């Protein structure tokens, strides 16, 4: 392969994803008629509209990474025969997609089946956070629908390379403060005799990112609707109620009632900054918010959720969250020594209702992480699609389903325990 031209150097905040070769994927189960040629045309149009998706990463002379343009066209969609594993258009990709950031930052894999199929889009995390990635998938289905219904994928206007978080913050005049926001956890560091916990072994092989185990649950549309209405009644978002439920569940399962729980979650800065930032205008435009949960037998979920929201609002008002990403390092080491185990959860982002042709329907969506990291991961992610709340646990802990079922039980019983009944 001929050497490509350097587009730009990865920023400090993006380098962590290159260091651990982090990809995210969205697996979509489809029911109905699939037109492979139309999907291929839509995917090609997506890449043409976002040329950075056809690039790859190379190490730089200073030990960092460069985003490099390819001289060759992106290989396109990979189609796999569900019966025998035979592939076409995969450029040598094996039956289990091999993710290699030195080759490609984007892969699309389709496995057609009778009556539908499975579509998996993989994207390197240095180029897209969850919001950015969801918008790309939405655009892919929109272009596919246009090809099927009109024969044309729609206008192709090449977009500029997305900016790093650092570049966007500099444009908006956001500067690094002395405090990162993590200082609120200092009071509990080495303050408790923490029980020893087993650490599962995680084998990391550079150049071969591995799938992080994931367990998930869905709330029904009615359960999600009841939860949203309950939140509105108490002026709380689903995010806040879910966060409180996760923390209360973790407190019960840990059996260390006297130990506070540090909680960290990302905040999408696109709509926090002024002027707002378009979803694909930046790669990972995230701040970090923190909360120290002090929970007891009498803790009320509404009070806990309300305090989480109040803390976030205060941290946004003083600008701590907006600049928190400027304190990020490029190494991931899990919970710092002496600190009670962190709880991390993404926000319950509402996925767009994606356009599909009349004879095709999306039945399920599942997210996943791939990386080559030796530190066990333990995090929750949430989302809402088609009116249903999805909660996932990503990581290597034992019995993740136990925690998820306890969270579900709490979320589904809270409205009735408060005497709230939908009219």
From Swiss-Prot:
<feature type="site" description="Important for mas ACP domain recognition">
    <location>
        <position position="313"/>
    </location>
</feature>
<dbReference type="Pfam" id="PF16911">
    <property type="entry name" value="PapA_C"/>
</dbReference>
<dbReference type="InterPro" id="IPR031641">
    <property type="entry name" value="PapA_C"/>
</dbReference>
<feature type="active site" description="Proton acceptor">
    <location>
        <position position="125"/>
    </location>
</feature>
<keyword id="KW-0443">Lipid metabolism</keyword>
<keyword id="KW-0444">Lipid biosynthesis</keyword>
<protein>
    <recommendedName>
        <fullName>Phthiocerol/phthiodiolone dimycocerosyl transferase</fullName>
        <ecNumber>2.3.1.282</ecNumber>
    </recommendedName>
</protein>
<comment type="subunit">
    <text>Monomer. Interacts directly with the acyl carrier protein (ACP) domain of the mycocerosic acid synthase (mas) protein.</text>
</comment>
<dbReference type="GO" id="GO:0006629">
    <property type="term" value="P:lipid metabolic process"/>
</dbReference>
<feature type="site" description="Structural role in the organization of the active site">
    <location>
        <position position="129"/>
    </location>
</feature>
<dbReference type="InterPro" id="IPR023213">
    <property type="entry name" value="CAT-like_dom_sf"/>
</dbReference>
<comment type="similarity">
    <text>Belongs to the acyltransferase PapA5 family.</text>
</comment>
<comment type="function">
    <text>Catalyzes diesterification of phthiocerol, phthiodiolone, and phenolphthiocerol with mycocerosic acids, the final step in the phthiocerol, phthiodiolone and phenolphthiocerol dimycocerosate esters (PDIM) synthesis. Can directly transfer the mycocerosate bound to the mycocerosic acid synthase (mas) onto the substrate alcohols.</text>
</comment>
<keyword id="KW-0012">Acyltransferase</keyword>
<dbReference type="GO" id="GO:0016746">
    <property type="term" value="F:acyltransferase activity"/>
</dbReference>
<keyword id="KW-0808">Transferase</keyword>
